[in-house]
């Protein structure tokens, strides 16, 4: 295979689209050292160490500003995001660096699809010198058939030079000697200095987030599943809100756990695998994910003892321990292709640590746009004296880190798709209330059931002040005392004080959208203070 068209020369050998069997042998063979080395665990899955980068490095992400992107991309100087600009000259220098690193080596080339829809999918080619990175790509992207591989033509190329270091970073105006950079004219991603596999996965998600909405297709950071009658639900939510847990439901088949599109035919997965967190994983609490960790799965940054036993509770390396596996490692999935019809339920998950939001409320179309653009969740951060103060996070479209267009473009496309399908939106709080405890998973699952089986639409409701949300007064299987968060406080004035605090944060965050007529009009759909 000739890789000279990419600037890679004198390659000693190319292992093209290796099988899982070949990858297992390559990543565990004797003589491998450092971060290239895979360890076989007692569950049969290989475990690797990704070095100092145990997560994405958003500060090292840059995109070439040229005629393609200048007027379409949502740049870092236009809003709080990671889309920092570089010029063609810096790109050329980084490309030389990566191609030099890969030239003269034995390389792995993996071809795959991003997106199950043949009309809009990206044909991805990843070139790397590290076997386990090739394995990660094979797990996470959609695996073409032998027939498809025979005529495969990439329309996006990822060159992963994890072993190279950029010593000229300061004069180039970059953040460090590591880089993850994109060129949308050349349709290429270059990676240098970081070994973290997620840079390839989320890099392609950012590209789908650019190309699809410009074609009127929703591109979503969400999980999706399908009921026995073919009804589809999508779950938006930031990390820790329950996106994976709640969409993995024995009564429903999984379409995907993280990245989806919504076009004229319905909802479709971008990926061929899952990338699950494994910190504190147990067979009892999450049997589906635990049972997916077997041969062909790839663990990252977990602690493996000498006998191959895995300590899932050990966070000494990172809280962000992960496993990637092909989607068919989950038993109850939509087959043969990870796609469904149009969604009729859209669920926004928020873990509110302020104890203000109701466990569930049905949203109007204007509220849907408002809460989608706000993308709110909150965490409890412990302080030295044991006092816990909630930390709010507002992440536009529940995926700010991966947006390449202005957030309003995603909201517009999503709402159009929802209106055409007659879909309803719901805000579900999986966080805390006035009792100081987190809303139980049993109550949250019963709420999700009520949304999916339609019983919530027949429930009596009342309006909650300040946030003006419509709240049901009773739902099957849900403790009625929690449905109005005010009832969980001994003194309702406590709720009101917290609600005013949170409302102020929502209002301040939304100010960035009020420079347009539509954004200014949406203010009325958010919380109101007298």
Swiss-Prot record:
Instruction: State its cofactor.
Output: Mn(2+)
Q: Which reaction does it catalyse?
A: oxaloacetate + ATP = phosphoenolpyruvate + ADP + CO2
Query: Quick one: which residues bind ATP?
Result: 202, 221, 237-245, 286, 322, 438-439, 444
A Gene Ontology molecular-function term? metal ion binding
User: How is the subunit organization of this protein annotated in UniProt?
Assistant: Monomer.
Record's PROSITE patterns? PEPCK_ATP (PS00532)
Keyword hit for ATP-binding = yes
Does the UniProt entry include the keyword Cytoplasm? yes
Q: Name one GO biological process term.
A: gluconeogenesis
How is the cofactor bound, as the UniProt entry phrases it? Binds 1 Mn(2+) ion per subunit.
* Biochemical pathway: Carbohydrate biosynthesis; gluconeogenesis
Q: What is this protein called?
A: Phosphoenolpyruvate carboxykinase (ATP)
Entry keywords, A to Z: ATP-binding, Cytoplasm, Decarboxylase, Gluconeogenesis, Lyase, Manganese, Metal-binding, Nucleotide-binding
Primary location: cytoplasm
What are the record's GO terms for cellular component? cytosol
**Which Gene3D superfamilies does this entry report, sorted A to Z?**
3.90.228.20, Phosphoenolpyruvate Carboxykinase, domain 1, Phosphoenolpyruvate Carboxykinase, domain 2
- What Enzyme Commission number(s) apply to this enzyme? 4.1.1.49
Q: Which residues bind Mn(2+)?
A: 202, 221, 258
Cellular localisation = Cytoplasm
């Amino acid at each position: 295979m000739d890789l000279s068209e990419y600037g890679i020369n004198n390659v000693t050998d190319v292992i093209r689209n290796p099988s899982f069997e070949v990858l297992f042998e390559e990543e565990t063979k004797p003589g491998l050292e450092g971060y290239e080395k895979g360890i076989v665990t007692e569950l049969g899955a290989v475990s690797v160490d990704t070095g100092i980068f145990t997560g994405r490095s958003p500060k090292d992400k840059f995109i070439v500003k040229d005629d393609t992107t200048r007027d379409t991309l949502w740049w870092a100087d236009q809003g709080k995001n990671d889309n920092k600009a570089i010029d063609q000259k810096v790109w050329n220098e980084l490309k030389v660096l990566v191609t030099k690193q890969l030239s003269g080596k034995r390389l792995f080339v993996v071809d795959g699809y991003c997106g199950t829809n043949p009309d809009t999918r990206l044909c991805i080619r990843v070139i790397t010198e590290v076997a386990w990175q090739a394995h990660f790509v094979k797990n996470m992207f959609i695996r073409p058939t032998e027939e498809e591989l025979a005529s495969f033509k990439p329309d996006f190329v990822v060159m992963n030079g994890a072993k190279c270091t950029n010593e000229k970073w300061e004069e180039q105006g970059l953040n460090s000697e590591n880089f993850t950079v994109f060129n949308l004219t050349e349709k290429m991603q270059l990676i240098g200095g970081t070994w973290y596999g997620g840079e390839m996965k989320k890099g392609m998600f950012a590209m789908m987030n650019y190309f699809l909405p410009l074609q009127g297709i929703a591109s979503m950071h969400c999980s999706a599943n399908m009921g026995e009658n073919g009804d589809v639900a999508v779950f938006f939510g930031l990390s820790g809100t329950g996106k994976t847990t709640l969409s993995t439901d024995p009564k429903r088949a999984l379409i995907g756990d993280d990245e989806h599109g919504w076009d004229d035919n319905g909802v479709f997965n971008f990926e061929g695998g899952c990338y699950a967190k494994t910190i504190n994983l147990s067979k009892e609490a999450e049997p589906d994910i635990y049972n997916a960790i077997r041969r062909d799965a790839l663990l990252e940054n977990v602690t493996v003892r000498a006998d191959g036993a895995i300590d899932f509770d050990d966070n000494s390396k990172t809280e962000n321990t992960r496993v990637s596996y092909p989607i068919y490692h989950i038993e109850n999935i939509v087959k043969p292709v990870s796609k469904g019809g149009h969604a009729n339920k859209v669920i926004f998950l928020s873990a509110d640590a302020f104890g203000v939001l109701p466990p569930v409320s049905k949203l109007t179309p204007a509220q849907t746009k408002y809460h989608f653009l706000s993308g709110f969740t909150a965490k409890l951060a412990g302080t030295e004296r044991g006092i816990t103060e909630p930390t709010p996070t507002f992440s536009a479209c529940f995926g700010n880190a991966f947006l390449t267009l202005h957030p309003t473009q995603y909201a517009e496309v999503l709402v159009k798709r929802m209106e055409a399908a007659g879909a309803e939106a719901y805000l579900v709080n999986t966080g805390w209330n006035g009792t100081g405890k987190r809303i139980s998973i049993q109550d949250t699952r019963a709420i999700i059931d009520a949304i999916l089986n339609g019983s919530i639409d027949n429930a009596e409701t009342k309006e909650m002040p300040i946030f003006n949300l419509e709240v049901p007064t009773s739902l099957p299987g849900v403790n009625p005392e929690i449905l109005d968060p005010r009832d969980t406080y001994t003194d309702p004035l406590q709720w009101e004080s917290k609600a005013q605090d949170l409302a102020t944060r929502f209002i301040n965050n939304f100010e960035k959208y009020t420079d347009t007529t539509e954004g200014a009009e949406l203010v009325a759909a958010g919380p109101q203070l007298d």
